[in-house]
Amino acid sequence: TRRSSDLIFRKQLQTAAEECLIMRKDTYQDCLVLYPESAWNEQMNELRERLNRWDPTHQTVFRQFVSDVEIITLDANGRFLIPKRYLKMAHIEQDVRFIGMDNTIEIWAKEMADKPFMAPETFEKELQEIMGTPIER
C-alpha cells in the first residue's frame, strides 16, 4: 500500500535533506515508527554505547531491535510503500493517521489512533507528574 506522508512531515524531511527513512514496528504499541536516517543513527549509537557485546542477552535484544527494520525511500511525490507485513503488524487495513513524536513519525491504523491513548484523568495526572519533575542537566 502506497501512502503519502502528510505535507508538514514531507517539508521537514526535505528541509533536513534526509535521503531515506527507517521503519520498524514500535516496541510497545501496535503502530509503525518512521525514523529519519539521522535520528535512527543517533538511536543506534546510543543503543550500541549501552550494550555489552559479551552479554548474550544484550546481543539478543540488539538483534531483536534491528531485525525487523525496513529502509524506506520517498518517491518524487512524497509517497512511500508500506510493506504488507508491516501493515499486518500494526493492524492497518485502510486509513492511517500520522502522529509526530519528537524526531520520529508514528503511523497508526486510523480507528486505533482516533481513540484516546489513555483516560483523560490518567493523562492529566501523568502529565502533571512529568512536568512537575525538575529537569536534570
Where do the language-model regions lie?
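Extended intrinsically disordered, low-complexity coil regions enriched in Ser, Thr, Gly, Ala
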Residues: 12-22, 26-27, 88-105
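Polyanion-binding surface elements
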Residues: 75-76
